Design a protein with these regions (language model features):
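C-terminal regulatory/interaction module of P-loop NTP-utilizing enzymes
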Residues: 1-344
Length: 344
């Protein structure tokens, strides 16, 4: 495969390849602005060692398969979300951290999805109750935190104090470089969320009605972001400039609507092979652990042919059996590497 077009190469070593990313296709060109600087908190990668391994060496990292590289780079070029499907423990979430690390795109914004998650959770939250309490306190009203009238008076804080952008909302701020957003386990959502995402993913923007209502008097409002920093929202709308690199993960437990699928680049991950598992163990636990855990890796591979097991179970087993006596090693491995699809 000709690698000249690749922005993300899967080499594990940070570089400035993102600067060579061509302009987006006309139908995915966004003009949000003025450009927002993410700030130091967004630039800090945080838990890279925990996600990718404290013992990793660039030369030893497993190079992604050609299909993975093509899908990731297609998503980068086309400014489309990447829908990654695979069994638990196949490295779906790790892809987001790997791309952010190699392309120096800062902290991964993570949006974990559960059955009660709604679109609003990802965009922003407005704490109307806290604002009402502050208004009452500032005016010395009778309802001020249970106090008597006149207990406190003063200026009411601006509305921006009560608005915090969620992971998706923060990713859509008009930054010069794309942010990385991980929407984890989208298949756990209720039936509406995938459809609710369509317009935001297509348009790269969303409105904050609470700020639109005051835009005539407060055209610029400073709000909190998911990074814990502040950003200015203008005219009550957030519109991206560099469309974020978005990874949607799924364990394959449900089908998604065609309208979402056609807006995504799709990638299916299979179970990792022996070489990839050994590299993973080496990256997280070191060379000696990978050498001593060879039998566990082979046992794990054997089980994965007929049972649903996850790679993090293997890491747990290699780590714990390193400290256990040989007599209990096999029992611990059986305890920790249990099939995930067994009848309950």
């Amino acid at each position: 495969m000709n690698d000249d077009w690749l922005i993300y190469r899967g080499i594990g070593e940070p570089h400035d390849g993102i600067d060579a990313l061509p302009d987006p296709p006309p139908w995915r060109d966004f003009d949000g602005g003025p450009v927002v600087e993410p700030g130091p908190a967004a630039a800090a990668e945080g838990n890279v060692a925990r996600r990718l391994g404290a013992h990793r060496q660039a030369a030893e990292l497993h190079r992604p398969e050609a299909e993975e590289l093509e899908a990731i780079n297609a998503a980068l070029y086309l400014r489309r979300p990447l829908l990654v499907t695979g069994f638990p423990g196949t490295g779906k979430s790790t892809l987001a951290h790997s791309v952010a690390h190699e392309l120096k795109l800062g902290r991964v914004l993570r949006w974990p999805v559960v059955s009660r998650t709604v679109l609003q959770d990802g965009l922003y939250r407005y704490d109307a109750l806290a604002r009402l309490q502050d208004v009452q306190l500032a005016s010395g009203g009778a309802g001020a935190a249970g106090g008597a009238p006149g207990t406190r008076s003063g200026a009411v804080p601006g509305i921006g104090k009560y608005i915090r952008l969620g992971p998706l909302g923060t990713a859509l701020l008009p930054t010069a470089r794309p942010r990385v957003l991980l929407v984890d386990e989208l298949d756990k959502s209720d039936i509406d969320l995938p459809n609710d995402l369509l317009n935001v993913l297509e348009e790269g923007e969303f409105a904050l009605p609470e700020l639109e209502r005051v835009a005539d008097t407060e055209p610029e409002v400073e709000v909190l972001t998911d990074d814990g920093t502040k950003a200015t929202v203008r005219g009550g709308r957030v519109r991206c400039r560099a469309f974020p690199f978005i990874i949607l993960t799924s364990n394959g437990e449900r089908d998604f609507p065609a309208a979402l699928l056609r807006r995504c680049i799709q990638l299916k991950l299979g179970q990792p092979g022996e070489k990839r598992l050994a590299t993973m163990v080496r990256a997280h636990l070191g060379e000696e652990a990978a050498r001593l855990g060879g039998d566990l890796i082979r046992e794990f591979l054997g089980r994965s042919q007929s049972e649903l097991v996850a790679a993090d179970q293997l890491l747990n087993a290699v780590y714990l059996t390193h400290y256990a006596s040989p007599a209990t090693r096999e029992d611990l491995a059986d305890l920790l590497i249990q099939r995930l699809d067994r009848p309950r």
